[in-house]
Structure formats: C-alpha cells, structure tokens
Amino acid sequence: MTLYLDGETLTIEDIKSFLQQQSKIEIIDDALERVKKSRAVVERIIENEETVYGITTGFGLFSDVRIDPTQYNELQVNLIRSHACGLGEPFSKEVALVMMILRLNTLLKGHSGATLELVRQLQFFINERIIPIIPQQGSLGASGDLAPLSHLALALIGEGKVLYRGEEKDSDDVLRELNRQPLNLQAKEGLALINGTQAMTAQGVISYIESEDLGYQSEWIAALTHQSLNGIIDAYRHDVHAVRNFQEQINVAARMRDWLEGSTLTTRQAEIRVQDAYTLRCIPQIHGASFQVFNYVKQQLEFEMNAANDNPLIFEEANETFVISGGNFHGQPIAFALDHLKLGVSELANVSERRLERLVNPQLNGDLPAFLSPEPGLQSGAMIMQYAAASLVSENKTLAHPASVDSITSSANQEDHVSMGTTAARHGYQIIENARRVLAIECVIALQAAELKGVEGLSPKTRRKYEEFRSIVPSITHDRQFHKDIEAVAQYLKQSIYQTTACH
C-alpha cells in the first residue's frame, strides 16, 4: 500500500493501515507546488534583507537580534543542536515514525518555507524506516515539542542516533551506507522542523489506536466474565439504550448482545437474581462513555495532523505576501484531548478490576471456588492477580491527573504559558499499558472461571476466544508464576492491534 500525503486529508486510519502494511509514502504534486511557493517567499525575504523572526533574527528572547546574512544557515544548525535536550527513554519506533509523517504532512501545507530537499529527506527516512531515536522527556508543549523534534532533525542532518534494521547506529553511518547525503539546512528550515506539536500528536495517535482497540477487546473479556457469573442479559436490550440516545452506549450494548448470543450460561431477570451489580449491568454505559472520549480525541488529533503549526507562518493572498508570528505551535487543544483520553482508558481498567474481583471473591462469585484456587488453602490461585490489578488501577488514578492544568514560564518569561501536552501524552500511554495488563488479568481469570463453569455453555463467539487464548494461557491446575501468563496475554493483545486481522 502507498500512503499519499497532501497536507490536508491524513487520517488516523491511514496511519494505522500504514503501520499494519509497512507502506511507503508518496507526495501529491499539488503539495509539492505549495512547498515551492512558500520557499520562494523565504528566498525573497533573504534577498530583500527583511526582518522576519527565525529567518533573519534569533529565537525566543533573541527575536530582536538581527543575524548576519552569511550566518542564516548556521543559525538553523545551531538551533537544532542547542535544542536537542531531550532526556530519558526514547519514544517507541512507531511513535518516532508517525512523528516524521506528521511533520512532513505539516510542511506540505505550504506555510513553513521548507525546501524540497527537506521534504524529500523526511520522505526518504520514512520509506527506508530510518527511525530517529527521540528521548521522551524535555518538552513543555509550547513552542511545540522543541526538544523531541530537534532530535528528529539531528538524524536528518546526520548527527543523531537512529534505529535501522533493528540496530542502533549513527545517522551519518546509515546515510553513507545508503549513499545518501545528510540534509544541509537552509534558512528557516531548522525552525520549520521543530516548531510544532508532532511529538505529543504522534504519541496521541498511537495511544488512540491502542485505546480504541482496548475498548473492543474489553468487551469480549467482559462477556467471558458475564457468563462465568451467570449475568443477566436483559440490561443489554436495545430499547434500554435507545431511550438514552448516546450512540456509543447503544453500540456497546449491541456488541455485547452479539458476543453473548447463544450462551446457555447467561440468565434473565429474576431467574437467579433480579439485577446484576453495576460492573456487569452498566457495561454499555461505562464502556460507551469511554468510546465517547475516544471519538473526541480522534477528532482533535485529526485536526492537528492536518494543521500548520509552525511559526512564523507564510501566506500569499492576491499576490501579497504575509509572514506572521502566531501561536499555532501551542499544544493546548491536544493536551486537553490527551488528558481526556487518560480518563477514558482509566475507567476501562477500573471496571475491569471490579469485574475480576467478583470472579475471585467467594462472597460474590456464586459457586466458583475462592480465588478460583484448584485446592483452596494449599494453593492461592488468583488471589494476588487481583492485588496486581488493584495496584495498576490505583497507579492510573495518579497518572490521570491532568497535565494540562500545569504551566511553567520559560525563555525568560517570553514563553510564559505552556501546555504540558507531551507530558499528558506520555502519562496517557503509561495508563494504556497498565490498563492492558489489567484486562489481561481479567482475561486469565475469566478463562479459568469459564472452564470451571463449563465452556460448552459459552456463546459460540466467546468460545472461539476461549480456545484462542487457551493456546497462550493453560488451565490453572496448580499455583505457578502467573506474571508470565499476564504478560503473555498483554503482549498478544498489543500485537493484534497492528495486524490486519483485528481482535474485534
């Protein structure tokens, strides 16, 4: 598959397909023409010796310092080197790859003044899967993601570290191996590479993809739990949800009915009890609300994926040129969205932990043994799996605190309000990893509970899931190192996201 970039129409589904199918990038001709026109404006500014921020002046507090024309290119290289102050563990290779795609798409809007050489260098790195190693920490989220994007830019000019064919190498060595020249930054180009929100947005895109999939995966896991507890299906009737109007809730209820169709383990109202606890009865309402969050986040991300968030921005209208210093680099809209994402995913984990507690608690699990132990007393069974889930959801409650309510001044108070959007993105992904493990714990426990109940009573769809995951996690016949089972399921759930055959 080829992904065609035009600066205007990139979607998250495009990105997901690109990652699944190991695609290549192509650029449409109209976008290249826009790049040429905006670059011509920069060249005119240089020729006319105009005073324009970041082209003929310094940066930040030094915006009033005029640069000697012979040093315009040096200014851009100095910018990249000095701003590459990222720290900590690197972003995943998927996030770094998406970061390059998003920055390229922004340049194609034709408001940044980049050269075709810069555009082609980004395209080359993407298509050859030369992945810059980009530290996660160091961004305030305004002026955009300066530190992470500077590490991206270092790789393009042959000075950074990259991951290539599974090995960490110097960018310069990889470029020599591929007979490719490092990029020679021209006036404005360093700024055009780093003034933007691509780090937080790229992590946000990956987080959205994985969150949405977790939402779908949580439904069949919940369906296993529901059957193991002889849950009541009446609460999932369409008319119950239609009168509330939330489409996401209606959709979850429909999918739950589909997962449970044909089960002989489910019950009706008053057969065993009149109504279930909320963690079973309210799955459509709780999970549906998370999908509402996901839909909002998707909308915000796709706006930003196709936005010009450089500074200054170049405009041409009726043969008149405008170069305007604005603030589109400010990450506040994405920071808010990614803080919301943390809430949506945290609740999937919270309700999962409460469901699995019902499976192991002898006061709540009906006729199942305490902690599903094969020999209660001598063997502890799933006792500490619930502890682990409780620990993860409690950690998520701390991580879910909104990063976007924080701000700190920088650049001698010139940049006196920042978004902390990349912090929101990073914490959000930690929540996703924790939530995936909580759902893996519920899966391991629900598989065992279903076995004890009798898998022949499962619905056909959940029986297939049971068989699929029993190939990863064998029956619990004695105590063992359950952390291995949990991690194996969590990894399987994660890997399935980027396969063309999804779990849902």
Swiss-Prot record:
Q: What is its main location?
A: cytoplasm
E.C. numbers: 4.3.1.3
- Return one GO MF term: histidine ammonia-lyase activity
Keywords assigned by UniProt? Cytoplasm, Histidine metabolism, Lyase
Reaction catalysis annotation? L-histidine = trans-urocanate + NH4(+)
GO terms classed as biological process? L-histidine catabolic process to glutamate and formamide; L-histidine catabolic process to glutamate and formate
GO cellular component, as recorded: cytoplasm
Q: Which pathway does it operate in?
A: Amino-acid degradation; L-histidine degradation into L-glutamate; N-formimidoyl-L-glutamate from L-histidine: step 1/3
**One of this protein's Pfam families, by short name?**
Lyase_aromatic
* Transmembrane portions of the chain: none
Where is this chain's protein located in or outside the cell? Answer: Cytoplasm
Q: How is it modified after translation?
A: Contains an active site 4-methylidene-imidazol-5-one (MIO), which is formed autocatalytically by cyclization and dehydration of residues Ala-Ser-Gly.
Cross-link 5-imidazolinone (Ala-Gly) position reads: A142-G144
Q: Which domain of life is it from?
A: Bacteria
In this chain, where does the modification 2,3-didehydroalanine (Ser) occur? S143
Task: Give the similarity note.
Answer: Belongs to the PAL/histidase family.
Show the NCBIfam families listed in the entry.
hutH, PRK09367.1
Q: Which PANTHER family match?
A: HISTIDINE AMMONIA-LYASE (PTHR10362)
Stated name of the protein: Histidine ammonia-lyase
Source organism per entry reads Staphylococcus aureus (strain MSSA476)
**Taxonomic placement:** Bacteria, Bacillati, Bacillota, Bacilli, Bacillales
